[in-house]
């Protein structure tokens, strides 16, 4: 018995798109910096911390292993156009940049995702970010800043 499978392939035009990876918080640099350090320390090993320049980088984070690597990486990044690729491992290195703008602080997160391709190149290949992880982290920072306002008694008054 012969089965014929047909289908179509959709090619993205104009390259990969990503969610925004920066956000301005209505809080001073010192407050935002403290939240950044606490938040990053909760899930990653900090490699570099430079408060003067507002920069924090992480050691590589494991993003999936074995057969699950490709599935997990696809949640956060765009798969490279490597048709025969098989992915045995994934990782991400994050950089956080905080910049004071008067009474506000802008935080920009850069995520570099890579997958280890074990069929053709046998090397680590870049997976362009979708901005998903960065947005989750920016939301966590916003929530932490909001929680600190309520703890300090500066939040909105409820009547």
Model-assigned labels for residue ranges:
Residues 9-159:
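Ser/Thr-rich, low-complexity intrinsically disordered terminal regions
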